[in-house]
């Protein structure tokens, strides 16, 4: 019984040690503001193409196709 208790204690200590090293680091997120792409024309149906166009042509951080009434539009995300 003592051997079983020491194995359980060792496993618990290993779990605590592992959890201490795996703690996520918090980074202050930068707020992004969205606005419709100025270079995209037509309905947006390709997220990857929209993202590439926003990043490469408009110097945005990100881009995606979002539904904005009445159709999907390419929306670019810039730091506020």
From Swiss-Prot:
Signal peptide location: 1-29
Modified residues (Pyrrolidone carboxylic acid): 30
Subunit structure as annotated in this protein's UniProt entry: Forms oligomers in its native state.
Keyword Transcription regulation: no
Family (UniProt): Belongs to the DEFL family.
Cysteines engaged in disulfide bonds, as pairs: 33-80, 44-65, 50-74, 54-76
This protein's name: Defensin-like protein 1
GO biological process: defense response to fungus; killing of cells of another organism
GO cellular component: extracellular region
Subcellular location per the Swiss-Prot or TrEMBL entry: Secreted
Gene3D superfamilies: Knottin, scorpion toxin-like (3.30.30.10)
Superkingdom of the organism of origin: Eukaryota
One Pfam family this sequence matches: Gamma-thionin
Keywords: Antimicrobial, Disulfide bond, Fungicide, Plant defense, Pyrrolidone carboxylic acid, Secreted, Signal
PANTHER family hit by this protein: DEFENSIN-LIKE PROTEIN 1 (PTHR33147), DEFENSIN-LIKE PROTEIN 13 (PTHR33147:SF101)
Main function: Possesses antifungal activity sensitive to inorganic cations.
InterPro entries to which the protein is assigned, alphabetical: Defensin_plant, Scorpion_toxin-like, Scorpion_toxin-like_sf
């Amino acid at each position: 019984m003592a051997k079983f208790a020491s194995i359980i204690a060792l496993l618990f200590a290993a779990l605590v040690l592992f959890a201490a090293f795996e703690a996520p680091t918090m980074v202050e997120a930068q707020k992004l503001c969205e606005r419709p792409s100025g270079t995209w024309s037509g309905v947006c149906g390709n997220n990857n193409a929209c993202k590439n166009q926003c990043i490469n042509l408009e110097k945005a951080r990100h881009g995606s196709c979002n539904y904005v009434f009445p159709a999907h539009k390419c929306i670019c995300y810039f730091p506020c």
